[in-house]
Structures are given as C-alpha cells and as structure tokens.
Amino acid sequence: MKFGIERLLADPTLRAPLIGKRVALLAHPASVTADLTHSLDALMALGDLNITAAFGPQHGLRGDKQDNMIESPDFTDPEHGIAVFSLYGEVRRPTGQMMISFDVILIDLQDLGCRIYTFITTLLYILEAAAEHGKEVWVLDRPNPAGRPIEGLTLLNGWESFVGAGPIPMRHGLTLGELGNWFIAHYNIDVDYRVIEMEGYAPNSAPGYGWPEDRIWINPSPNAANINMARAYAGTVMVEGATISEGRGTTRALELFGAPDIDASAVLAKMRDFAPHWLSGCILRLCWFEPTFHKHVGTLCHGIQIHAEGPGYEHVGFKPWRLQALAFKAIRLLYPDYDLWRDFPYEYELGKLAIDVINGGPALRLWVDNPAATPAELDAMTSPDETAWEQERRAFLLY
C-alpha cells in the first residue's frame, strides 16, 4: 500500500504540474513516508520542486503543543530556511500575506476520522482561502484509521466551530481527500483541487481496515498514540467536555476515562444493564490511573479502559460514540447530582457548554440528563442522521 505522499515522490509525472510553481506544505509530525522520512525533508530532497513555505495545524508542525487553545508561533525552519506559518496561533485561517507565499499547497495530514479533530476544519479554511486567492490545493491522501463506519449526531445549523466544520456526523468514515471534495460540493467552493490518491487502500478489509499492519504509527497530535485511540476517539473526545478525566496526563489518553469520586465498577455494571448492545465490538477493562497533568492531576482515578484491538475487536459492531454516551448516562443515573459537564472556554467558543460544542448541539447532553430517556430514544435521534450521511457521502468515496 502506498500513501499519497509516496506516490507523489515516486512518480515524476504526478509532480509535473508542480514544476516551476511555488509549493507550500501543510504538515505535522505524522506527515512521514513509510521509512519515517518527514514529508518536508523528502520533498526538499527531490530537487525538482520549489518549496517556499510550510504550514502547521493545531499542535504545530512539530506537534509539541497540547490541547485546547495552546497556540503555536510562526518560525523559520532551521534546516531548510523557509517560513513556517501557524494555523493555530494568532490566526486559524490563513492570511493574505501567508497565501502570497505559494501557488500550490500540498496537504499531508494524518486525520483520525472524527468531526471534532481540527485538521478537517483547517482543510476547509485552506480551501476557502485558496478559492479567494486563486491558489491550488492538493491533498496527499492518507488512511482514515477509524475506517468507514458512521456514528453520531449531525452538527446542527448554527453550531459550526473550529471543531465543527459542517453538517457531518461525529464519525464520518471519509479520508481527508474525500472530505475535501465534500466540502467543495457542500459549500460551493470554486477552487482548483486535486487528490493524490492512495494505492491499495482497503478500508473495509481486516485486520487493519485501511491501516496497513506494517505501517508505523506516528502521533498526529500529542495524545493520539495508537490505532486503539483513533478508533475510540469519536467517543472519548466527548470527555473533554466533562469533569471526569479522559486520561490526559497518562500514557493512554483518550483510551480511558474515570474520576476520583466515581465507582467505575458500578458505572460499568450500570452500562451493561442499561444498553448492553452498545458495548459490542470491544473489551472494557476496569483500571486505575493518576494523571500527571490536566484534570485530576496527582489524584488517583478509578476508570474504564476501552480496548478496540486484538481478538475482542469487531470493526462494524464497535460504537465508540454510543459507548461514551452510555458511560455519561450511567454516571448520571448513579450520581444524579454529579457535576458532570465542564463549563470553560472550549476551542474559542464562549457561552456554550463544551459538550454541546463537541456534539454540534445540545441533544446528547439533554438525553444524558433526562432520567427517563432510553437508549431507543437516542437511537431514534441518531440513526436517521447516520443513514442520511451514508447516502450523501457515497458520491465522494474514492476507494
């Protein structure tokens, strides 16, 4: 299997339209070839491209910044001497001054397949700026490590944000290249756009469901440590909007959740009693952890770890969004007065609860907080969105 970057590097005919043009690269630490050469270094080494600038998304080109409004500065690359512009610093949309530094921008970002992962919003902002300034956008495509499954509520009109680029469900099942085509169609963006497709991508095939077994995983963001996290993320990311810990400050962030003042054994038992069919496709294991930073720092937490890997993993049956919704529901049923929802500025959104920003509306939170609400009622809200998206996205599937 070859990723888009590898096809571009190997085939001079693919690169031919870039010759004589000023080329920029939007990348992060996971922008590497199969032998772990960073894409910027590999493109520079070709000798036939004029690389004039680089861009970094949230967490930075170097991937050194943590979550939620921890910004990266612009800098000059010390090896190649080109400007590196931050798209998560003073601005999140590229400025006109940034746009005049190139003719074509190559986007080589490893996504996680989740609406809230901000790289897809950065893609949208680049497409819109490129349309305004007459620039070309090429996506060097990479696998969606969460695969093709769809899950979650569609973002409501008026709830767009940096973690909500458009009316898509939480788990969208598209690659970045495919999403670019959807953005262009949905928002009617007049831009010169091209996808350098992968070769041999098989998102519905076991065991990796699009992620090759022999491919080394590199964190695209500091807490995206492995495929298990990528699969669980569409659910565990919701814990960012709660007072319980998502495991930041541990080595398994966004693969587990817990708090010092809950009985995780009781929570798991309640989950199994309330909606056991939402727990399929993975193994849930009770655990203890003590965050070294972030929520509940230095405090022993009782929690649950999600194992969406190994013999217990079932790709189609795994429902991370419903699983995490169920965990919230179990906590609310066991502890009716628990201060569950975290009220703080979240990804530059003020005046809205983070859990609502994450879900693109209040429906999930209202379901959790309603003691009479049933699993069937959440399914009744969510399933039509999932079915509609499955039909809508068909026209944009490249693989």
List where the protein language model places each region.
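Short internal beta-strands
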Residues: 50-59, 140
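Glycine-rich, charge-decorated loop segments at or immediately adjacent to ligand/cofactor-binding or catalytic sites
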Residues: 63-67, 138-160
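Glycine-rich oxoanion-binding loops at beta->alpha junctions
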Residues: 67-102, 114
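Conserved functional hotspot residues or short segments at active or partner-binding sites
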Residues: 258-379
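Glycine/threonine-rich flexible loop motifs
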Residues: 111-123
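N-terminal phosphate-binding or glycine-rich loops at protein starts, especially the Walker A/P-loop
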Residues: 1-49
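Glycine-rich, aromatic-lined ligand/substrate-binding cores of catalytic
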Residues: 201-297
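Conserved anion/nucleotide-ligand pocket segment
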Residues: 159-234
